[in-house]
Amino acid sequence: MRKLFILCAFLLQFLSPVYPQQATTATIEPNLKYGKPSKEELSLTSYAPDTTAAAIYLFHQGQSDFIYHDGFQLTTEHWVRIKILKPQGVSYADVSVPYYSPTDKDEGQERASEIEGCSYNMENGKCIKTPMKRESISFERFNNLYKILKFSLPAVKEGTIIEYHYKLYSDYFSHIDNWMMQEELPMLYNQYKITIPHVFVYNIELRGKDYIQV
């Protein structure tokens, strides 16, 4: 038997004191179909609850599962869609993901795989998709304990939607990384799922004053 836990934060602009709701807030329905941004998302030009936002997360979804091959591993997948609203938001197309990869090979390892991404731009009334090339992906040694996955989404400017996906494999299945329901950018939709085998028991702790559906 497996246990499924879902943490879900929907339309966090209604919850967060950092991004207060305005009286005339106009929101768009979250579109969770990865690879298929909606017309409303493509035409979005500003974010009413925080008009200073350079970009917003349209969604960030995560899913963790346990696999077994000569021992348990924990896998965590990320699916992200971000709308660039202002020129200074272009920097969010450069993504860095640190992960544990000690030089001592006798220790447990983490690795990143299944990395993909693309950008979407409206040109002459048509949605133009530009996939990320493999040469835009790199792995850098940060120190003797960590590596950093780095990649840059192409053809990004004001108005662009970027999407990316990656998967982390970890030998440290006894430790589940924290999941941040809110980031420095406004978050329209955030969801994390984990399926836990019945042989494992974890303590789940929610932090923050706002209610999160579990």
Residue locations for each model-derived region?
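Beta-strand-rich, non-transmembrane domain signature
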Residues: 21-214
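Bacterial Sec-dependent N-terminal signal peptides
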Residues: 1-26
